[in-house]
Amino acid sequence: MFRNQYDTDVTTWSPTGRLFQVEYAMEAVKQGSAAIGLRSRSHVVLACVNKAQSELSSHQRKIFKVDDHIGVAIAGLTADGRVLSRYMRSESINHSFTYESPLPVGRLVVHLADKAQVCTQRSWKRPYGVGLLVGGLDESGAHLYYNCPSGNYFEYQAFAIGSRSQAAKTYLERKFESFQESSKEDLIKDAIMAIRETLQGETLKSSLCTVSVLGVDEPFHFLDQESIQKVIDTFEKVPEEEEDAGEGEAEPEAAPGAAGTGEQGGSGDQDVAPMEI
Amino acid sequence: MTTFTVPIDNGDSVRIAEEESQRTLYPYVTGTSIVAIKYKDGVLMASDMGGSYGSTLRYKNIERVKAIGKHSLLGASGEISDFQEILRYLDELTLNDNMWDDGNSLGPKEIHNYLTRVMYNRRNKFNPLWNTLVLGGVKNGKSYLGMVSMIGVSFEDDHVATGFGNHLARPILRDEWHADLSFEDGVKLLEKCMRVLLYRDRSAINKLQIAKITEEGVTVSQPYSLKTFWEFSSFHNPTAGAEGSW
């Protein structure tokens, strides 16, 4: 996108009916590291790539528990994401307190979307620069939603956001039809495989990703490193055509240092294709 | 005259008097007991149709049990106008719930907890809704029966009663209630309780309704009367054992 005379304020329309500031906010989501969500009839899996500012620092938290039955994965300005997660937790707990009953996730995402919309219609505000993948339960089962800085929200069977998410989406598009009836284990495996797609060449290790699960009769929780590594081991043993030669053998821990070129993951995402989300 | 000193700006005594008169101090038109039980298919709730004005049995056509949404029944004893206010709050609540139109709906547990919050908060402001509420319902096959008092005391049980019902009906229910009562047995049990209340509660009238809620929905019976028996021999000469009394 190029600069133009209609992109200074969020309250200025362009002659073609666009709000550029909102679209720029959606660009910020694409710069964040990848986050992926998938759901079956009874479970939702959220997974993300762990990105650290530098080798010295720890990685940023991108998946948050909102309640026992709702979790959210974010991509974009993590500060905005943290604030919105706090809002979601607050809404959820207030509902629980008044009604002693879990807030249906469909209603939470509408509240969230309405909050985002306000920021697209006030001259003294700016849109939130974060995309949220909200997974949760309500009376009709498990749901996955994507909340956009524009104030729109969509329901998905599976979705990926952030940098190099198109690779993950391609993988998910091939397999999504089976997700509704998938078992929890298969869903987790598909999530980690989708994460692998976004790494594009880097060896997949459990330290590089965070995975969380929630389901009917199963409160939101994170998978520990061992469980993730176990799942990785089941498919890293089978060399596939897309994998680089020499990678992905039967070693339980991936060999350090030999991860090949393109070791940095985080900075310089100029190779992100300007795709539509 | 009992007054609470509400700590507000002391300079304005007129305002203090106005604030006092805005709070509920005592009830005026009241309903008497509600008795409710869980049975095989859901919940049964019985109440009479009387509204007393002090010791006068003034109103004889008051429905004290109402359907709330698709899944619940609310019965109230105590101040009738406060009950109507509560019905308005619940109306708003169920309307907003319906407007979501998203396949989720408020069940009896949610409504019970909402009412508990309302009653407790009013009590904390020294302005209670002068009712004891009974909330029964069925959702997704599960029956629910609970009670909230005017000070916000709230609990669930297999059978509940308010007011005099607590003292006269609950003992009968404790002895004779069991799980999976049939509809006929449930009604018989409730009628037994209501008959005792009719004999012994001065504010009860002989015109009652029994409401039923199941997975299918709510049915409130037409008003009817219980058969009573007054020909006990001791009633013929009531002062036989204590000459000189009346």
Curated annotation (Swiss-Prot), chain A:
Its keywords, alphabetically, are: Acetylation, Cytoplasm, Isopeptide bond, Nucleus, Proteasome, Ubl conjugation
Any single Gene Ontology cellular-component annotation: nucleus
Query: N-acetylmethionine occurs at which residues?
Result: M1
Q: Where is this cross-link: Glycyl lysine isopeptide (Lys-Gly) (interchain with G-Cter in ubiquitin)?
A: K51
Query: Which cysteine pairs are covalently linked by disulfides here?
Result: none
The answer, when asked if Cytoplasm is one of the entry's keywords, is: yes
Subcellular location per UniProt equals: Cytoplasm; Nucleus
Q: Which residue stretches belong to region Disordered?
A: 237-277
Provide ranges: composition bias, Acidic residues: 239-252
Q: What happens when the gene is disrupted?
A: Do not show arsenic tolerance phenotype.
Q: Which domain of life is it from?
A: Eukaryota
One of the protein's GO biological processes? ubiquitin-dependent protein catabolic process
List the biased-composition ranges (Gly residues). Answer: 259-268
Q: Which CDD domains does UniProt cross-reference here? A: proteasome_alpha_type_1
Q: Which Gene3D superfamilies match?
A: Glutamine Phosphoribosylpyrophosphate, subunit 1, domain 1 (3.60.20.10)
Give the matching Pfam families. Answer: Proteasome, Proteasome_A_N
Classify the main location: cytoplasm
Task: Tell me its family.
Answer: Belongs to the peptidase T1A family.
Q: What does the subunit section of this Swiss-Prot or TrEMBL entry state?
A: Component of the 20S core complex of the 26S proteasome. The 26S proteasome is composed of a core protease (CP), known as the 20S proteasome, capped at one or both ends by the 19S regulatory particle (RP/PA700). The 20S proteasome core is composed of 28 subunits that are arranged in four stacked rings, resulting in a barrel-shaped structure. The two end rings are each formed by seven alpha subunits, and the two central rings are each formed by seven beta subunits. The catalytic chamber with the active sites is on the inside of the barrel.
Describe its function. Answer: The proteasome is a multicatalytic proteinase complex which is characterized by its ability to cleave peptides with Arg, Phe, Tyr, Leu, and Glu adjacent to the leaving group at neutral or slightly basic pH. The proteasome has an ATP-dependent proteolytic activity. May play a role in thiol biosynthesis and arsenic tolerance in association with PAF1/ARS5.
Q: What is this protein called?
A: Proteasome subunit alpha type-1-B
